[in-house]
Amino acid sequence: MGKYTRRQFITSAGVGMAAVAGLGLAGCAPQTPADKAMANTGNGGTTFADTIAWDGEYDVVVIGFGGAGAVSACYAADAGAKVLLIDKAPQGMGGGNTRFCGQIILNSDDKEAMLAYNKAMAGDFAVDDELMDAYAEGLTQTKTMLRDFFGVPEENFLDWKEDSSAQPMIAMFVPEYPELEGGDALHVLTVSDNVCNSALWKTYRNKVMSMSDNIDVWYMSPATKLFQDPVSRAVIGVEIDKAGETVNIRAKNGVVMTIGGFENNKQMVEDFLGLTKSTPAGTLFNTGDGVKMAMGVGADLWHMEAYEGNCFALGGISFVVNEDQHAKTFNDLRNLSGSVIVVGNGGERNLREDVYNRHGHV
């Protein structure tokens, strides 16, 4: 059975997060013997966990089957854990934003350069040094992880710094901010010969399926509540709406929340981002449920005003679509003849169509 420290687990999961454009990961620490002793109610040694009618038990429960959820579940299972991986989407419609993103992986062999670049990207924002170090360490191991653990053949990798002929605009990401320290040591990779084809997501999904002896997957099963010991504050389980039936699952060694954002929750978008008109470019299932559950057990919020428009698409401009549809964006007007302009509802032109946009800072 494999052995992983807490930092190694977070770093490995962090690789997955970075590879899928910053998907969120938060882990709840397992109970220690001291925690369990503190949680005794004094009623004959009964613990808080004993007061709940459990319908099942796993070593680890992972909420959200996107890239970060898949990576977390696979590493936990590799360490010998019995894992439950749940997702609110139906089978065939899951994958979170990992499925819809460009499948582009930031990578470097130089950890110090990666660290310097990420710190420069953070600008004046205060970011925990240990978190920054974990990201930099993980991003230097991305290719090795995908090759050795997830089974991507060496010949499948494409380094777009060396060859961007399939999609010339990808060259702008190598690096995206060349003026920042460390940028010259960065590369971007894909696990296939193109982008926006869900290839990275399929790699993660296939690994999860191959570990079905240790990983159970429940679709159409959103988490609705976290069970938190009132004394130790440890999260010990999850309430799940499994296809309309409420089930309580105990997590003996922790709950991992890879729950995506809130881009499909109009009230949260208005409250946190100040937007009254927006259209999701990725999954239609990110409605902020996990954010609310995390707040319910005392989690602080950070960077809730930060969001990304499609950097390929003139800063995220979309045609008007129905609420149950993905954004329909302009991908790259520079590939056209030069005879196209973009105007708003009032007929005004307010941007340059002949230049690329860039992502905002971290």
Predicted ranges, named:
Residues 2, 8-30:
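N-terminal export signals
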Residues 54-66:
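Beta1/beta-strand and adjacent pyrophosphate-binding region of the FAD-binding site
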Residues 56-58, 244-254:
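Core beta-strand elements of the Rossmann-like FAD/NAD(P) dinucleotide-binding domain
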Residues 79-98:
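Glycine-rich FAD pyrophosphate-binding loop
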Residues 102-136:
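Glycine-rich active-site loop/strand segments that organize a redox cofactor
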Residues 137-246, 266, 314:
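Conserved redox-cofactor binding core of oxidoreductases
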Residues 250-318:
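Glycine-rich loop(s) and the adjacent beta-strand/alpha-helix scaffold that form part
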Residues 291, 300-362:
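An anion/pyrophosphate-binding glycine-rich loop and adjacent beta-alpha core
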